[in-house]
Amino acid sequence: MRCPFCGSEDTQVKDSRPAEDNTSIRRRRICPDCGGRFTTYERVQLRELMVIKKSGRKLPFDREKLVRSFEIALRKRPVDRDRIERAVSGIARRLESSGETEIPSEEIGLQVLEALKSLDDVAFVRYASVYRDFSHAEDFENVIAEINAKIARDTDAGA
């Protein structure tokens, strides 16, 4: 693995351990040339996924972009990083096991919305406002009414 600090190709693994519910390996590495230390993650990739954008353009699936989407929606919200990682891993696993190699971006967006709905209502509304292209206050009101109806159904079911 190339050192991100000096570019040396000769790095050494100092520690390896399972991470993210045993779906990846976390490796601590050190560069003998510059002494730099860094962490890498190794994940199983079942197939190379391509995302089909609304414009028709195809891009490789980027797990880190998915993580950033969650982080933006959840900014300043009380949700642990581990819960974000589990949600992202679940989405990536479902996409990889779907049998499809080309996934519409809309499908990924729907899965993110579903995950955010169970993580944090505020983050769900934030993401929905961008994903569904809200342009009026009524759009927010409709989503909030949808959340309130779900809460009422859950409360009635638990009573």
UniProtKB/Swiss-Prot annotation:
Domain ATP-cone, residue spans: 49-139
Composition bias type Basic and acidic residues, residue spans: 11-22
UniProt cofactor(s): Zn(2+)
Primary role: Negatively regulates transcription of bacterial ribonucleotide reductase nrd genes and operons by binding to NrdR-boxes.
PROSITE patterns linked: ATP_CONE
GO biological process, one term: negative regulation of DNA-templated transcription
PANTHER family for this protein: TRANSCRIPTIONAL REPRESSOR NRDR
Protein name: Transcriptional repressor NrdR
Matches recorded under InterPro entries: ATP-cone_dom, NrdR-like_N, RNR_NrdR-like
Keyword Transferase: no
ZnF unnamed span: 3-34
Gene: nrdR
Family classification: Belongs to the NrdR family.
Keywords from the named record: ATP-binding, DNA-binding, Metal-binding, Nucleotide-binding, Repressor, Transcription, Transcription regulation, Zinc, Zinc-finger
UniProt keyword Transport present: no
Molecular function, one GO term: DNA binding
Annotated stretches, region: Disordered: 1-22
Cofactor note: Binds 1 zinc ion.
Domain of life: Bacteria
